[in-house]
Every structure is written in structure tokens, then in C-alpha cells.
Amino acid sequence: MVNYSNCHFIKSPIHLENQKFGRRPGQSIKISPKLAQNGMVEVIGLDFLSSHYHALAAIQRLLTATNYKGNTKGVVLSRESNSFQFEGWIPRIRFTKTEFLEAYGVKRYKTSRNKYEFSGKEAETALEALYHLGHQPFLIVATRTRWTNGTQIVDRYQTLSPIIRIYEGWEGLTDEENIDIDLTPFNSPSTRKHKGFVVEPCPILVDQIESYFVIKPANVYQEIKMRFPNASKYAYTFIDWVITAAAKKRRKLTKDNSWPENLFLNVNVKSLAYILRMNRYICTRNWKKIELAIDKCIEIAIQLGWLSRRKRIEFLDSSKLSKKEILYLNKERFEEITKKSKEQMEQLEQESIN
């Protein structure tokens, strides 16, 4: 239902990417009782496991393949009709279970029946991750700046919401099969009668998608899993942070698609620990484990070609010895992505017109 075979890069709004990163001081915050009965939420944003990254990337690949126009009837939202204060078009995408599993990266294996079929365990993990995105409420806090009468002002919104809405259906079920779905929704035999999904993204997945976004390979997380199967969730968050921080810095330095020479990111080690949501290490002040985990993240980023090198510097901060990372971006990798993704986006735009 979605032709994504030529979609090798995905677009993601920076507003969405920002939700993946932790922030200091990492404490609970009070929010409106309308958002949570006890008025407290422990995590702000998207605290993902690696499987959730894969599932979200699969949805974004399917959305990108339709140039964020969808392939079934979407909806138009007014600012008054949603807690995101979003105004505009929300696309919907219809796809089969097979299309999702392929976009997720689930492997097929040759069975005793001489057929290539999806791994049952991997497929179950992928579908569980999809359902997590559609059922788990996330506290999303975002800001948008604008100018009014020469003065910069900030619009802020926050809401407790899943990041996608999932519709699905089955046809021709027996009573036994209907009950079976309630018991084992991912692996029941009746899934052969599954008629597919329709997914509606929440506004933050499409907000300013044409003007404030990052581009990344569609297989960005599959590459991590293939090369480093035991990589922690911190590695996934770190790669996303590098891509997002690089895009933000380039936007400040240049107005075209070029990447400046010797572009680097400068980040305090403690701040990076918060960004990567290393809360259990931070709470116990286990800085040795934090540095080891960060070292591994940087090593993975270098081997995957996102960074060319790094430098750790010690300095005094309020009379205390602190450390920061200087992370040098691999210009060639980012330039290649920019060039090839531009060609893809132009092709998708042309196809949507035709």
C-alpha cells in the first residue's frame, strides 16, 4: 500500500527529535491535573528503548515515502481542536503488517516449508514497539519562537499523549479467533485475517516538517543493530543527538546546504549524561560508568562514520574539576546524506504532483 522501496532517507521534525533528549535537573515537574491525576510525571519527552526507535523510524519512513501527505484520508486541525496548538494537515497512512515489519527491519528466515518468513520473536518485538507508541502516554513539552511587533515571544505547549493513533481491523473471524486476538494479539493464527493498519501521527510528528527538520538514513537504527547488536539505548539516543545538534549548528552557520569545515560539537560530560537519560547512573553519582557508557557511544558513532574524532578536555567549573567532549563531525557523511536525500525528496515531490 506504501511504495517505500526507494525511500532511503527519512525526514523528522526537530521538535520531535528534541523530545528524545533528557534535560537538567531531571526531576519530576508539576503539570495540569488534566494531564495526570496526581499532577506529577517522572519523565519529560520520549524515553525510548531501542525497539521503540526502530518502530518510530518505520512509521517515519512510510510517512516520508508519501511526502508526508499520507495515502488515505487525513484530517485538518485547528489550534483550538488539539492540545498541541497545531494548525494544519495531519496525514494518515495505511499499510499492511508486512510493510511495517519490513520497514522496521525484521529479518526473514528460510523455514522448513522452504519459504522465507519473518522471525516470530523479532516480529513480536516490532509489533509490541508499535503498540507502545500508540498506547503509551508521553509528556510532550515543546516551544516555538516567533516575532510580534519586533519582539521575540515564545509559544509553549505541553500535553500527555501517545505519539501515534493506531486503527486496525480483522475480517471473517470465528468466535475462537476473536478471543485468541485478545489473548495473543501479536502471534495469533488469526493475524492472517488482519486487514492492515491506519496510523495517524500526533502533531509533533509533522509540525514544521517542511522548514525545521533533520534528515537521516532510513536504516540509521538498523545499522546500529547490525554492527553493534548489544548496543545500549544510549547509543541510539546519542546518534540522534549528534544528527540533531549538527543540523541545528549548521542552520546557524550557513543558509545553504553546505557543511562548514571542521564542524564540531562541544558538550559537558555531565550535560551529555542528562541528554542521554542516564538517570540511574546520575542518581548514584556513578561518574565512572557514565564516562564508560559515553565512551562506547562515541566509539560507535566514529565507527559508523558520524564522527571523525573526539577530544576530552578537563576544566575548572565553579572550582570543581569538570570534563567536556569536543566531537568532530564527519563532514563527508553529512554531505553525502544532504546530497542524496535532496535527490530523493525532489523525486517524491514530483511523484506526489503526478
From Swiss-Prot:
Keywords: Plasmid. It comes from the Bacteria. Changing F264L: In plasmid pCHL1 and plasmid pCTT1. PGP2-D is required for growth within mammalian cells. This is Virulence plasmid protein pGP2-D. The lineage of its organism: Bacteria, Pseudomonadati, Chlamydiota, Chlamydiia, Chlamydiales.
